[in-house]
Amino acid sequence: MRGALLLLVLLSAQHVSTSQFWLSVEVEQIDWTDGCLTTALCSHPRFQLIKDLLPVNEKVTMNWPIVEHFDKESHRPFVSYWPSGRTEDISMSAQVVGTDRTYGFPRICDQSPSVRIFPEEHKKIVAHLEKEKPTGKPPMDSLKIKVKGKCFNATMTVIKHTERCPWCPDPKEITIIGQEPGSEATGLRAGSAAWLFGSSSSLISDDRIVHIGVLVLAIVAVLSSTAFAIILVMYLRNKRLVKETLKKPRFHPYISVKGHEIAEDNCRYDLPWEQQQRPLTYWMTSSNKSSESTMTSPLDSASSLHGSGGSHQNPHMYNSHHHQHQQQQNAHPSEMYHSTYTRDGYQTYRPPPPSVHPPIFPPQTQLFHPPTYSTQRHVTSPNSSRNDDSGLESV
């Protein structure tokens, strides 16, 4: 039974010792030998501490320059972390390193032998002291060691931390304020309500600010996309309209309408030339007033003149014709222009008479022709025609 118990104790001790731990080393005092480093031909010396895990040959080093204020600088703690291993396998040594003054290569100017920090005997002593003076706190392993070289003697304090890191606070010393489960649920509800509707201390939280920013950016992106689409559609539409206007002629040919102007009282269509140059004949008129005064065309008047031949014109006839022409000119315009005539089924207004006055011929003198075979004087009357002579008298 005793052997089994010892085996269990050793296994438990080994399990505890192989867990992670921290080692903190603080240099308390260093004594230097005068002129030692000068005679050793070491330039730019530095004091260096080396921690070594012997089974795996893992080393952690730290050094300080040897200057005027070295005592103040060296009092800083040197903390090393070991994820696995035993504290009994940790050894420590001190060195003075620098460069050779003659050749300039790095060299070790002075060093001390390696010393185990926590040997097996020290562990037994600590366990015995803990039994004699039990305390509520877990044992904190700490001890002072001295290392000695040719030019220095150093005294250091080493502390082992197995439960927590040196800078971590003790959880037993932290005061924990308890909270009931009901109050916790009430606190969660109050927190959610404050996030939604805001609270007196903080109106909006960081999450709400992020959500609002994302929403604003989304709205700006949608508006920008809509405006761009509208501008693009308007541009394409204007471009199409410009192309259509370029295909069509801009200027239409100018057509003068002066030649086609028609007076209100004139005819509605172009009349033949013979109707424009002379008045209308009797059969084309329909008014009573125009039928009373018979108008003849210039051609008819000329034929009548030629028909009269050498006979003199009747003055009464000429005067009546002239009187009728004056009456026609003095007639009211409405009576002249409102007379209509029909031709080819179209009824239109009668055009005004020409403004050219008929020619006035001077009165002709009467000619007396003496007879050839008879002594009887023959006087031609004005009413006689030139065709009355059969031609026998003149022969």
Curated annotation (Swiss-Prot):
Question: What segment(s) does the record annotate as region Disordered?
Answer: 286-395
Q: Which residue stretches does the UniProt record annotate as biased composition, category Pro residues?
A: 350-362
Q: Polar residues bias located where? A: 364-385
Q: Which Pfam families has this protein been placed in?
A: C2_nem
- InterPro entries the UniProt entry points to: C05B5.4-like
User: Where are stretches of biased composition, namely Low complexity?
Assistant: 286-306
This chain's protein is named Uncharacterized protein R10E12.2
